[in-house]
Curated annotation (Swiss-Prot):
Keywords: Aminoacyl-tRNA synthetase, ATP-binding, Cytoplasm, Ligase, Nucleotide-binding, Protein biosynthesis. This is Proline--tRNA ligase. HAMAP family: Pro_tRNA_synth_type2. Its EC number is 6.1.1.15. CDD domains: ProRS_anticodon_short, ProRS_core_prok. Its main location: cytoplasm. It comes from the Bacteria. PANTHER family: MITOCHONDRIAL RIBOSOME PROTEIN L39/PROLYL-TRNA LIGASE FAMILY MEMBER (PTHR42753), PROLINE--TRNA LIGASE (PTHR42753:SF2). It is an enzyme of class 6 (ligase).
Amino acid sequence: MRLSRFFLPILKENPKEAEIVSHRLMLRAGMLRQEAAGIYAWLPLGFKVLKKIEQIVREEQNRAGALELLMPTLQLADLWRESGRYDAYGPEMLRISDRHKRELLYGPTNEEMITEIFRAYVKSYRNLPLNLYHIQWKFRDEQRPRFGVMRGREFLMKDAYSFDLDEAGARRAYNKMFVAYLRTFARMGLKGIPMRAETGPIGGDLSHEFIVLAETGESGVYCDRNVLDLPIPSASVDYDGDLTPIIKEWTSLYAATEDVHDGARFEAEVPAERRVHTRGIEVGQIFYFGTKYSEPMKALVAGPDGAEVTIHGGSYGVGVSRLAGAIIEACHDDAGIKWPEEVAPFRAVILNLKQGGSDTDAACEQLYRDLLAKGVDVLYDDTEQRAGGKFATADLIGIPWQIMVGPKSLAEGKVEVKTRSDGAREMMSPADIVARLGAGTAAS
């Protein structure tokens, strides 16, 4: 993509309404535009990041055996009355009526709808286990939306729902999602720490929030420092095998949100030098809720003996749009964003330091074509902006690889390459940087 043809409305000043780094940088970098309190338009740069995050979430859900579908944003109020949650959910639910006076709501979550879909089609234990998920926009009318996408009213969420014949099967489904979430966040450059948490309006008696430690987070958390060093399961993990050892390794060390924190247990189990009390960002949460929805909504299947059995369920959410903000909170410096490669809007940016110069123009054009031919998602800054402005833009938007093409380096057959993550610089031939980035694209 040529920057001269890309829509990138960068702000020169820090927006006054932005209280935290991620909100400020997302607005400054032209990723978002606020349309109303807690409601944002995702502009091209931000939308590219959002789609990269969504794809990682999708790949890890598929790897764990979940099946993707798509449910509508609008739901019938009667479904929520059937489960008993319509009145209990409170003012966060956006309730509307259509022209025929039918009561609808803009879905804040989908337990009722997915249970209704399940009971309409699944009649036998032979069709179990089943895990269905979708990635869809949600709306919760937060009383005080703030911090940009970290606490918006409209947000993109991955929500999965498992159905099993009994509690043992449901806990196996829970464990699969537990492991899938560890891998999902690690691929984005984050350490999502599973912490015991309250179940809230979703219900049930088992839940873990996945927390990214950050001082700007809204959740108070307590954990054993050693949990930060636990290994992430590899891509070859066998989801059909016994995942219990992985779960035990991660849950044997103390980690809890402030809602369920046990101070006496924390002090008894964790040596003083390993106690961590800080804040964090919730990027996902998983629940086992048994028969909370299947019982009132009569989601039954015929068991092995022919008798009807009430299924056991769980739900598993990832804040897809929130993750964009969480990654920035974890990956930035004073100059701007430092995107991990897997979620970066572009993998590399070519900076023409003498726009209009015949040699630099020709070298940039050739480099641009060569990188595209290798499948590298590259941005070419072919604008008339001065070199200092190009450097500032590249740092602000956080492209992992910056390739600087200037007359001096070209005279030696080289370009200067800077990695945004650590600021390291290296002189390379154009062919070498194409080979390096092309090899990375092939590997991924």
